[in-house]
């Protein structure tokens, strides 16, 4: 698929404008306000969606708020990153010991748990946008992947491209978790669909209602992509 250069914030803004309010679990644009605790607090607890930030300093602040939400039962799970590159842990309430959340290390086998995991990858100063998908018995086809994949390369550094990527990483419960950016993981165990779109540089965080269908998300992403490309064409 051809590579195009797109401004991350413009893409997020275009995507946000297309999402019906009824489908938005959380809506936040962090271009001016970069307070991770505020971001974390704005995530709708009832939707049980987690925040991932690609900035380790902000992530540490947000992690405290989210961990508190897990411990108090507001949130079902949360994700942590270490250096804006890899998710190292998943915290869920520990049913055997409610005072201590259960830690699952990155790469652990998941069994009979509805957990959404996605990887953030930082390269050459820029980051990825990612659509994570926990799906019920879904066939993730190359067509769907292509529909949801938008690569942004830095033309000034073709040998060491700086990029933002929108990709889909599909996995279900009892699937092995893989950290490579291009890895596609599929499984057959049941899990309710949940979607999270986020900007790891806090250009924008959009958490979609987990009831949205894959086709709806694919359409939104495609329309937003076309909107940005059309705008770029008009400016040329």
Regions inferred by a protein language model and the residue ranges of each:
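DNA polymerase processivity clamps
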Residues: 1-236
């Amino acid at each position: 698929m051809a590579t195009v250069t797109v401004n991350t914030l413009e893409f997020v803004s275009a995507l946000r404008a297309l999402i019906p309010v009824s489908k938005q679990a959380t809506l936040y644009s962090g271009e001016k306000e970069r307070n991770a605790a505020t971001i974390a607090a704005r995530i709708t607890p009832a939707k049980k969606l987690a925040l991932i930030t690609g900035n380790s300093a902000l992530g540490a602040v947000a992690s405290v708020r989210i961990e508190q939400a897990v411990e108090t039962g507001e949130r079902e799970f949360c994700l942590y990153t270490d250096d804006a590159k890899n998710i190292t842990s998943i915290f869920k309430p520990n049913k055997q010991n409610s005072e201590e959340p259960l830690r699952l290390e990155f790469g652990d086998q998941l069994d009979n748990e509805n957990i959404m995991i996605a990887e953030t990858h930082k390269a050459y100063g820029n980051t990825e946008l990612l659509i994570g998908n926990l799906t019920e018995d879904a066939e993730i086809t190359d067509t769907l992947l292509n529909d949801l994949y938008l690569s942004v390369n830095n033309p000034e550094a073709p040998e060491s491209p700086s990029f933002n990527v929108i990709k889909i990483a599909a996995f279900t419960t009892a699937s092995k978790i893989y950290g490579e950016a291009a890895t596609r993981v599929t499984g057959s165990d049941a899990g309710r669909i949940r979607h999270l779109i986020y900007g790891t540089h806090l250009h924008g965080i959009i958490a979609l209602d987990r009831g949205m269908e894959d086709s709806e998300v694919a359409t939104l992403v495609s329309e937003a992509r076309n909107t940005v490309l059309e705008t770029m064409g008009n400016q040329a």
